[in-house]
Amino acid sequence: MDTRNARFFRWYRTLPLAIMAFMLALSLGVDYLPINMVRSLFFPVSYAERIDDAAKRYNVDEHLIAAVIRCESGWNDTAQSTAGAVGLMQLMPDTAQNISQMGKVDTNKFDPNNLTDPATNIEYGTAMLSYLQKELGSTDEVIAAYNAGLGTVQTWTKDSKGKDFSESITYPETKHYLERVNEALRQYSKYYPNGMSVL
């Protein structure tokens, strides 16, 4: 047996052990895996510096931005929905135009017609989150409004009358979206406690 075949068979024998160790760690929970492995496998972040810059500029939690991106597009900067939403943060072109007309974004740097550009998409998506934060009272309301619209969430807030806000949500899709984004927000906050661009 030549050296190359011997190395292959040695590697092949250890592969099942490596897989078993990985599966055991997963069954025990991701807390037993090295943090960098958890980050890269389960909670990746692309465009960390762009997110950090936009978060500071608009006073929005960068973990929230990452959670929205994860749930909206799965970090696919070319994602397009059947409804016409575009890019990382799945913005509707009309929404970007409205944000632009309100003067929330520097249109000399970020053209609202260029939502497939990750930096532009993050800028407009974060500006939208910032606008919703100013209009609404809680992070849950902001997340729900990003999905269902500001007017709808304001109606739900009025109807909640002291109940937990999530109980007043009448759209199953938005209720599920709120749960998913909140879970992603918890995980990004846990695994990136010092920020997205600090690894």
Range-by-range predicted roles:
Residues 30-199:
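Catalytic glycan-binding domains that act on GlcNAc-containing polysaccharides
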